Amino acid sequence: MSGPNWLLDTNVVIGLLKGNKPAIDLAEDVQLDLRRIAVSQITRMELLGFQSLDASEEDHIRRFLGCCHVILLDEQIEELAIRIRRSTGLKLPDAIISATSIIKSLSLLTLDAELLDRTTRYQATR
C-alpha cells in the first residue's frame, strides 16, 4: 500500500463521524479507502477545537484521526494558501486545506462545491 490519495475536508470528516448521508454517499461514490486518507493539520485543529466537545466526542475524533495521515503545514502550503485566500476570499482554513491538497497532489474530498469551484485554477497549474 502506498500513501494517501484523498485529503478530507473538515465537513466530510464531521459528516462521516456523525453518520450524515451526504458525507457517506460521497465517500461511497469515490470508493474511499480509509487506509489511504489524509487530513490537514488545520482540520485536526478545527475538529479538536470545538468548544462544546465532550470527552466521548473527543475520543471518537482522536480515534478517527489516528487512522489518517495528518499533513502538517509547511512553507509551500503556507505560500499557496496565502495566494488562494487573497485571490478568492476563501476563509483561511479552506484556503489552507485547498493548498494542502494541491501541494501534496491529493484529491480533495469536500461537500463544499464552492471551495472546489474557487480553487480550480490553482489545481490546474500543478
Describe each model-derived feature in a short phrase.
Residues G66-S87:
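Acidic catalytic patch
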Residues M1-P4, S98-R126:
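Acidic, PIN/NYN-like endoribonuclease modules and their adjacent C-terminal/linker elements
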Residues R86, L90, L106:
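Short glycine/serine/threonine/alanine-rich loop segments
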Residues D9-T10, L47, A81, S101:
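Generic structural signal for small/hydrophobic residues in well-ordered secondary structure
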Residues V12-V13, T43, I77, I96-I97, ...:
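Alpha-helix capping/helix-boundary segments
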Residues M1-V39, G49-R62:
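Short, well-structured N-terminal submotif of metal-dependent ribonuclease cores
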